[in-house]
Amino acid sequence: MSLSLIIKWGGQEYTITSLSEEDTVLDLKQSLKGLTGVLPERQKLLGLKMKGKPADDDVKLGALKLKPNTKIMMMGTREESLEDVLGPPPDNDDVINDFDIEEEVVEVENREENLLKISRRVKEYKVEILNPPREGKKLLVLDVDYTLFDHRSCAETGVELMRPYLHEFLTSAYEDYDIVIWSATNMKWIEAKMKELGVSTNANYKITFMLDSAAMITVHTPRRGLIDVKPLGVIWGKFSEYYSKKNTIMFDDIGRNFLMNPQNGLKIRPFMKAHLNRDKDKELLKLTQYLKEIAKLDDFLELNHKHWERYLSKKQGQ
């Protein structure tokens, strides 16, 4: 019986339909070598498990009970990939095509049709609470790709692509904030990334819940047309007894994602080309200090997160 598998690697998806249940994991890796150029010994396939452990190369695919069109994330680097890693990202990358909220000057926040979309998400979107919200804590909402993790570069493990100081940042933030992950991908990829980065299993902090692209809404802007955004109103509507505009901050490398809540968004510098920038990126280290400073406030609406570095410098100079 033939299998249909979808492999995600380097920001792209590859469909494999040439294998059968009698083929092995190694056969799959050989097929992936032909598609991606990554040698089998350098491939790590997330989600291919046998009795709770990564499946060995000689395990037959039929023994893994894979469903049709199962999606598998691959980690791994081409032999010649350093050149690719240091090269420019694709021209159509979201980071390049992003725009400044203030320049767009669109009044979308209070449009009735957008508020209705948020109401539908509040009613229909199912949130799996991983750890209960804590009384008196503020809320930190975090994007994943280019915020916590360089998702375009190639590496043998996710840890190599992790933004520096990630665990220290989350450990410190957890003292004052409930932490929510919100990525514009599907939940399977979010869970796989959080596991690979060691976020979902870290004993020093806990994630309250995670949201995927299904919690986002589409809004219309005069200059840019239809765009997808992350409305914090979905969270506030579902957890109004804990979170509001006054105690929520969101980090994202794409400013348009908080177009519905510009006052609550902080546009973080994107973490790209991890192999080149890993030793010099200090963004999370500085933002750790910023979060600690503003945690003392009762109302975040008096802040302008666009000038967070100026605010931090002023506070530290006192």
Swiss-Prot record:
Reading the lineage from the top rank, the first entry is Eukaryota
GO cellular component terms attached to this protein's record: nucleolus; nucleoplasm; nucleus
What CDD domains does this protein map onto? Ubl_UBLCP1 (cd01813)
SUPFAM superfamilies membership: HAD-like, Ubiquitin-like
Q: What's a GO biological-process term for it? A: regulation of proteasome assembly
**Domain FCP1 homology span(s) in chain numbering:** 133-294
Q: Which UniProt keywords apply?
A: Hydrolase, Magnesium, Metal-binding, Nucleus, Protein phosphatase
Q: Which GO terms describe its molecular function?
A: metal ion binding; proteasome regulatory particle binding; protein serine/threonine phosphatase activity
Q: Which Pfam families match?
A: NIF (PF03031), ubiquitin (PF00240)
| Reaction(s) this enzyme catalyzes, per UniProt | O-phospho-L-seryl-[protein] + H2O = L-seryl-[protein] + phosphate; O-phospho-L-threonyl-[protein] + H2O = L-threonyl-[protein] + phosphate
Principal localization reads: nucleus
Where is the protein situated, by its record's location annotation?
Answer: Nucleus
- The record places domain Ubiquitin-like at 3-81
Domain commentary:
The Ubiquitin-like domain mediates interaction with proteasomes.
Q: What does this protein do?
A: Dephosphorylates 26S nuclear proteasomes, thereby decreasing their proteolytic activity. Recruited to the 19S regulatory particle of the 26S proteasome where it dephosphorylates 19S component PSMC2 which impairs PSMC2 ATPase activity and disrupts 26S proteasome assembly. Has also been reported to stimulate the proteolytic activity of the 26S proteasome.
Annotated protein name in UniProt: Ubiquitin-like domain-containing CTD phosphatase 1
Q: Which organism is it from?
A: Gallus gallus
